Amino acid sequence: MSELLSFALFLASVLIYAWKAGRNTWWFAATLTVLGLFVVLNITLFASDYFTGDGINDAVLYTLTNSLTGAGVSKYILPGIGIVLGLTAVFGALGWILRRRRHHPHHFGYSLLALLLALGSVDASPAFRQITELVKSQSRDGDPDFAAYYKEPSKTIPDPKLNLVYIYGESLERTYFDNEAFPDLTPELGALKNEGLDFSHTQQLPGTDYTIAGMVASQCGIPLFAPFEGNASASVSSFFPQNICLGDILKNSGYQNYFVQGANLRFAGKDVFLKSHGFDHLYGSEELKSVVADPHYRNDWGFYDDTVLDEAWKKFEELSRSGQRFSLFTLTVDTHHPDGFISRTCNRKKYDFDGKPNQSFSAVSCSQENIAAFINKIKASPWFKDTVIVVSSDHLAMNNTAWKYLNKQDRNNLFFVIRGDKPQQETLAVKRNTMDNGATVLDILGGDNYLGLGRSSLSGQSMSEIFLNIKEKTLAWKPDIIRLWKFPKEMKEFTIDQQKNMIAFSGSHFRLPLLLRVSDKRVEPLPESEYSAPLRFQLADFAPRDNFVWVDRCYKMAQLWAPELALSTDWCVSQGQLGGQQIVQHVDKTMWKGKTAFKDTVIDMARYKSNVDTLKIVDNDIRYKADSFIFNVAGAPEEVKQFSGISRPESWGRWSNAQLGDEVKIEYKHPLPKKFDLVITAKAYGNNASRPIPVRVGNEEQTLVLGNEVTTTTLHFDNPTDADTLVIVPPEPVSTNEGNILGHSPRKLGIGMVEIKVVEREG
């Protein structure tokens, strides 16, 4: 209803101003600005829905100030370009319409009415309401009743008798199991769901809407609200350190806790969270690659679901035979947006909807088949009678190719329980949310029926039942939940541990690199993660007077304030204000101690603009002084005009990447010498080893042969044509996720370059 009212007010404002207001520059500018704000808000809402499926939420607030990287980003480039072009066209059209009768005399009354209607359209828009609520949630002090509803359970289960298998299905919401809406999509897992305790109304609340947040909510009974963006939590050293979570209770009760997934455990800090709360045995892509049958059988995120669930079954067998009480948690990945992935062992590889194949539905149908096969193995085993199996989604599906069809349904998260000791078949329609999952499991295992803000759906009353406005209530509790981190409010002294790559201050520890915004009563950590912008881009968003401490590789800050460190990959500490004074200190000891020293200087806006512009220079445009191309730092020597076909810097150097160009091409600003030696320090990847690799300068070609280890080769070139470009052509680039950023598409690697040097020969 508010959408219609908002649009009606917008339309009325446009029509009244265009046909009645007449000519006046000030009123035109004011009305166009407000109407333009309406357009921007609604396009933001549309774009946010495209990415999150949940309008403008915490994730969007973070994304608006950071880059969106990760799985399938290329899928979103075209829609993003479309939005920008559409916005430009709408603004142009709006200005043209408003000035249609600019030759008529100005009418104050109609101008005022048009402006008021425009303001009303903004105020009535859902986008404005969502942003207002989000901003309020950032500034509230908390809610006085939080302590009354947040309850810590007993730290142990008396006389535990059941083992636990807990399966998180990535984005595998209950909506997919509606056979009328999506016929025969989930027959195997749907049949198992109908055999157990099926909770049909599990809400998704703020702070529970992405994987690590869903895990925290289901195991600790609280949303993931933190003094930093949730997916960046890989940088913290402990996770809600004061809270009692399900894993803590299980460990205290004699359980050995295991977690198995196909992706890297470090992503979003899952390893930190689990280790902080009772899990001593963790298996992710790094741990599994030495034990799986085919370590090369991977998708963009890690190992496919069939591989992961096979390993989970082996672990279940091993632990069951040992007689040791255990919990086994596992997380799938094949249903990750935007398209999902199809395991090769599936029978259900294709699902058509709306008359055409749909990749997301196909991934769901395949993944549920794998999960069902895993559960059926457990059910057929002699250990099932001592086992409780839980299946839940980590969160609702984000924008994937099935999303528009999901949105036509009443959407809920998946949560069902199969008890080997006490078979129960029932669908429970009680209102609940993700935070109730852990409390329900704890209740079944013989523990308390509450956990944080969660309540058992078998014997307690969910917050979703107590509060009709539970989403607003959850946001009101946000400051209280953030305080549970016990995060420091000041930073005066700090220590950098080079062996552990950690920084410590005021009792808190963070992984490096790290950027901190420091004010009188708050220290805001801004870690670097797969989903965040590089720290220098985040720093560029700071205000001129914001105090910062930035710990990163020296070369990343050298171009601003320490050019002598432009080739150093050591740690450096920079602090100051972008509009004031900055200092850079080289970390030259294993345990390096520093102090914050922010001077109250006069702000220089020209200096601020220069710093921001430099911080925003993209990696490939950075230039440094050197007599060779050093590949383990960003940018290139000053003599290089441009280059292509080369991947990002890594600690040792850079790979060629055929996804960025079939050949490595380095163009210099001036012609290369008439006679020179080309000294190449490099290695080959995969089938490129021991193969002739053409290296060309102008019309001359030499052959380079590399092995899998780094070697240095000197090639002799004559350059009579004054060519200025060096070309290297890897013979057989290999598509691989080796060393890739989690969630990115595979790279096509050919050669790994450490250094290339041009040495002029006499004569």
From Swiss-Prot:
Ranges that cross the membrane: 1-21, 26-46, 77-97, 108-128
Mode of membrane association: Multi-pass membrane protein
Pfam family, any one: DUF7024
Catalytic reaction(s) noted: a phosphatidylglycerol + a membrane-derived-oligosaccharide D-glucose = a 1,2-diacyl-sn-glycerol + a membrane-derived-oligosaccharide 6-(glycerophospho)-D-glucose
Keywords for the protein's UniProt record, in alphabetical order: Cell inner membrane, Cell membrane, Membrane, Transferase, Transmembrane, Transmembrane helix
GO BP: glucan biosynthetic process
Pathway: Glycan metabolism; osmoregulated periplasmic glucan (OPG) biosynthesis
GO cellular component terms listed in the entry, alphabetical order: plasma membrane
Top-level taxon in the UniProt lineage: Bacteria
One MF annotation (Gene Ontology) recorded for this entry: phosphatidylglycerol-membrane-oligosaccharide glycerophosphotransferase activity
Family from the record: Belongs to the OpgB family.
Full protein name: Phosphoglycerol transferase I
This protein's encoding gene: mdoB
